[in-house]
Amino acid sequence: MIEHLAINTPYFGILLSLIPFIIATFLFKKTNGFFLFTPLFVSMVVGIAFLKLTGIDYANYKIGGDIINFFLEPATICFAIPLYKRRDVLKKYWKQILGGITLGTTAALVCIYLIAEAFQFSNGIIASMLPQGATTAIALPVSADIGGIKELTSLAVILNGVIIYALGSKLIKLFNITNPIARGLALGTSGHSLGVSSAQEFGETEASMASISLVIVGVIVVIVAPILATLLL
């Protein structure tokens, strides 16, 4: 019967992505944010499992998946809206914001390298992991330029975002971080676009700070990751 499904049309990839995502979103809200029901994580697992169990080639999924991927960059640009609304905060605290994000992102890149070295990962794997702090649209080209594996980088970016989306807000509440600027910067710097989505649940200030973090982290990754790769790999 599977041969008769419309697997060669864009609808197959789109539905395989959206149906698990919608169901997971419902379950995520019903369970008060249980991390295993994080929509992106569930969609990824269900999609991979379905393709493996049915024997359908990834190329069939990619026809529709590419359409969804097309909207990735325009969706990222939309994060500029809360940033514009709270531009007064950005003007007032721009030194602290820029300094905190720069130090945090650079430290994260160095830590990724040190951990990877400790586990004796190959240079290709290390290069694949270095750009994971940026969005997919930025991380993949950087990974390719420094000798990384784009598929591995994509997985690292997704897992990084899923972890922050699932646990970031809980950690902020656990450590009683009440400053909206600090909350937004923490989520945006560590979790890129999914961190921004998580920050939006707190408020407009958090969302705007997370948005500027996403942009600055991307710029830092583009500059620092190739330098680290040249010096250390």
Swiss-Prot record:
Sorted UniProt keywords: Cell membrane, Cytolysis, Membrane, Transmembrane, Transmembrane helix
Main location: membrane
Organism superkingdom: Bacteria
A cellular component annotation (GO) from this entry: plasma membrane
InterPro entries listed in its UniProt record: Antiholin-like_LrgB (IPR024891), CidB/LrgB (IPR007300)
Topology in the lipid bilayer: Multi-pass membrane protein
Transmembrane annotation, as ranges: 7-27, 33-53, 63-83, 97-117, 124-144, 152-172, 212-232
GO BP annotation list: cytolysis; killing of cells of another organism; programmed cell death
Coiled coil: none
Pfam families in the cross-refs: LrgB
Protein localization: Cell membrane
Family membership noted in the UniProt record: Belongs to the CidB/LrgB family. LrgB subfamily.
Its biological purpose: Inhibits the expression or activity of extracellular murein hydrolases by interacting, possibly with LrgA, with the holin-like proteins CidA and/or CidB. The LrgAB and CidAB proteins may affect the proton motive force of the membrane. May be involved in programmed cell death (PCD), possibly triggering PCD in response to antibiotics and environmental stresses.
NCBIfam families per record: PRK04288.1 (NF003291)
Record's protein name: Antiholin-like protein LrgB
Species of the source: Staphylococcus saprophyticus subsp. saprophyticus (strain ATCC 15305 / DSM 20229 / NCIMB 8711 / NCTC 7292 / S-41)
Gene: lrgB
